[in-house]
Amino acid sequence: MCGVEGNVWDYTLEELQQMKLLNSNQTIPTFEDFLKIVDGKVPFILEYKLDRPQTKVCELANEMLKNYKGVYCIESFHPLALLWYRKHRPEVLRGQLCEEFFREEKYKGSFLMTILSFLVFNVATRPDFIAYNHLHAGNISRRICKVMGALSVTYTIKSLEEYKRNQKNFDLFIFDSCRL
């Protein structure tokens, strides 16, 4: 988004605020600034990107969200984020992001990534919806969850053709850079 190498946590807030978004004059807003700008005008999805088994970011964001009056939901690939919200903020809509990780070369042979692909942790996290990569719509666990009544969402649809191809497999769609 900014043409800079590294992860967000590699930089200080001051360094991040100097970076420009997509070759524009816009800078990266803090989450607090984002909430003030949105101010309940539109619903939003907050995706937690946990790269380790700790939920401090959930606690910090929740402090800013607990008095927010607008509509939002959270989603994450990491089941611990959903588990944290189930325990501390059960009224917040939770979504499990998923795909068939075991198909990726870097995860081949990983037991953890295989069980994540098959939504095994849903027993504990009890997500309100499952957001599965549309390229893996045939995943048996995703299909079972849908048959059992789980709201089935897909990401990220980038064309009208992808949307049409997936209409029967999913209930809701997350679009990215798409004009229908």
List each model region and its residues.
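Distinct, well-ordered alpha-helical segments
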Residues: Q54-L65, A81-V92, K106-M113
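Structural preference for beta-strand elements that scaffold enzyme active sites
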Residues: P43-I45, V71-E75, E91-G95, D128-A131, ...
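Surface-exposed cleft-lining segments at the edges of enzyme active sites
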Residues: K20-N23, E47-D51, E63-Y72, D128-F129
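Acidic (Asp/Glu)-rich catalytic clusters
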Residues: D33-K41, A61-N67, R86-R89, V123-A124, ...
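An active-site metal/cofactor-coordinating segment within enzyme catalytic domains
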Residues: M1-G40, K49, V92-L112, L116-S117, ...
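Helix N-cap/beta->alpha junction signal
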Residues: L50, H78-P79, H134, S159
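C-terminal active-site rim and adjoining tail of enzyme catalytic domains
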Residues: Q26-I28, E104-L180
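Conserved, mostly hydrophobic/aromatic
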Residues: L16, F34, L46, I74, ...
